[in-house]
Amino acid sequence: MRLKLIPKNEQELSKLFVLIFPLTLLLASLTSFLKDAYFTFANLIPNNKIFNYGFLDTLHYQATYGVLFATCICLSFTYLFSKSLGRIAILFPILFLTLLGLVGTEFLDLVLSFFYQDRINVVGNSSLLIILKLLVGFGLFSLASLNLLAKREASIFVSAQFIYGAIVFYFISLLISRSELVVFTDSLMIKSLHTSMYIYVCVSFVFLSIVHFLMTKPLGATLFNKTLTAITFWGFLFLLPWTNFKYYFGSVIPNWLENVSIYLSLSLLVPLLAFAVNYVKTIQTKEDEGNKSSSLMSFSVIIFLITNLLHIISSFENILPIVGLTNFQNVINQGYIGSLIFASISFVYYLIPKVFGRLVKYSRLEDLVFSGLKFMYPVLLINNFLIGVNSGYSWNAGANAGSPTIYGEGFSLSLIHI
């Protein structure tokens, strides 16, 4: 296996991110294990600047939604974007440095969190690091726009459309979090909007770009309907950025904004149905059964559909007060990032023979790993779901009795804003 220090094209660059992806996935899994292990054995472990749940939770967030997600963007952009445009990437050396900078700044953010815990921000630990992220984000947005304008195909494949949308919202999410806000309400609103744009939109769009490729090219299938794809793209584009405000129901966020968030969340059913129908009809035209990793792609779609259904159902009037400001928010976040992770694993298994020129020999180990992932991740989501609903009931029961209970309201506020 040869890995050039300075790649000359997208295929050589894809090798780099195919190798980086398992490492970042392992890093995210390790931080998740440390966080949950500390929560379980907190009474046996000393409490200091490193071993405390707030810091470990932030560390896990930066490893998962920072480093791992940046790697997924780079992996999908490197292989899918230019192929969808029908040409090689222009200004490739600058693009190579920009993609490395994207992963590098996120990893630097992770490292600096050990030294500047009192300056942790939503998107960075210091003003200089946030500026670096903005520069990298602007560079990636500019290069993607230039390549889009220089396309050779009359109509681009939908993967490029979703990737470009993810890059645009990634850059916007950095811009809106740049301001230092003193008023708590403003800070809470910006944090909520950042979550919607960064996790809901960006993660979903990278996932959709990978799935639309995996359900067509590797399986020899034909995309069922481009109109349904357009409904999926524009529906999620306009609706998802405003759907996180509802989870702060009853807090300091204005009531009109909460109501708008509720109505738009219910409207997610339209693009979700468009995607589900398009996926099912497209899969029915497949000519190849694919390899064993294709099952992870199908499983990722199931996780994505369930996550959005929970996101929609939580908007009902009798349910929202129970799930708002509880651990239920983690179910939505983990559902979106989990669907992307499973799709990316399947994508990496597809790329290995393409970029390295060697077949993947599946063994019982792969069967065991795939089965373990399919079993454990739903258990994780169900666990967070039950914790969130239980704490919501406890909070409402205590509030109605005149004695507010722990955990319910205030979740996700103290660790981030105080």
Which residues make up each language-model segment?
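Conserved small/polar residues in nucleotide/adenosyl-binding loops
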Residues: 416-418
